[in-house]
């Protein structure tokens, strides 16, 4: 009975996430505009860093208002200071205020603060415009976003996390895409709106 209840809860949660995910589509002019913010390094830890963070947030707002993107993508090292939860909410605020769909791919420094990857995942997926879903261990899952054309899917945007650091003791340095991720990317799939790994 526990397995059936767990399965039903998982299916309901997945369906709920699918229902809330905004649809992405090319405009009538044939364009799809993406604003990408990478290596934001938002840090609210000291008065100086908070002042710098406010300049960053103001610049993000300016870009979003000037460009009117169809999608916002955050890639790597978004928050690199404590208190990380406050910084995550602050960096996502300009996107949420504009009701823009967005996706986050973590960098190697995001989980070095006072939040785990799962805690970051819960914050990111708490926003209505997120296209992220939670995967193994509650972390942000790899996703492929379908961008619709007038009659059929016109483009796919893959968002994969290469993780933090090497998981092999004899190899130093940063992480990489796993064989499982590469296999997921290569696998032929029937796409609906978005697929999580």
What are these regions (language model features)?
Residues 19-90:
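N-terminal active-site segment of His-dependent metallophosphoesterases
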Residues 2-8:
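Sec-dependent signal peptide recognition
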